[in-house]
Curated annotation (Swiss-Prot):
The keyword tRNA processing does not apply. This is Large ribosomal subunit protein bL9. GO terms for molecular function: rRNA binding; structural constituent of ribosome. It comes from Rickettsia peacockii (strain Rustic). HAMAP family: Ribosomal_bL9. Keywords: Ribonucleoprotein, Ribosomal protein, RNA-binding, rRNA-binding. One of its GO terms (cellular component) is ribonucleoprotein complex. The lineage of its organism: Bacteria, Pseudomonadati, Pseudomonadota, Alphaproteobacteria, Rickettsiales.
């Protein structure tokens, strides 16, 4: 299937790119998410005319996302959970919970689909989580999962100590 991107898509292309993609990927993801349109002759002509509009709109969205990224950057989210004796959680910390807490902290609604978890958080500790609000921009937040507030503070002190040691080694 041949498509024209109308929004930038990570690892695929930028606005106005004409690409051949698998039929299922185009039909089930790109078209319903309004990331692309079919590459017919009338659509190709339309994109040539409207490419500047799409790019201006994307630039405006990108500027807004950069402001949000500045708020998100260096956030530390603390989750207090019950655990077994070996530090394993009863359940897990989900991307929805991270999105809700982050939205609460910065007063801006973040969707759970913007939270990228490499693997589920199922034990206490410090985790880095990627927040992707735009195809070309992402932010990193620190998620601390602990049994109590005092344990969370210990994790924070430990992280600051490691960071200062890393800075001393690199100097």
């Amino acid at each position: 299937m041949e498509i024209i991107l109308i929004k930038p898509v990570r690892k695929l292309g930028k606005i106005g790119d004409i690409l051949k993609v698998a039929d299922g990927f185009g039909r089930n993801y790109l078209l319903p998410q309004k990331l692309a349109i079919r590459a017919t002759e009338p659509n190709k002509e339309l994109i040539v005319k409207q490419k500047h509009e799409f790019e201006a709109k994307d630039k405006q969205i990108r500027e807004e996302v950069e402001k949000i990224n500045a708020l998100i950057k260096d956030q530390q989210l603390v989750f207090i959970r019950q655990t077994s004796n070996d530090g394993k959680l009863f359940g897990s910390v989900t991307n929805k919970e991270i999105a809700d807490k982050l939205s609460e902290n910065i007063s801006y609604n973040i969707s759970h689909s913007n939270i990228i978890l490499d693997k589920q958080i199922k034990s206490t500790g410090i985790y880095t989580v990627e927040i992707r609000l735009h195809a070309e921009l992402n932010a990193i937040v620190t998620v601390i999962v602990a049994r109590s507030e005092s344990e969370a503070q210990d994790y924070l002190r430990e992280q600051k100590t490691e960071t200062s040691e890393d800075l001393a080694e690199s100097a």
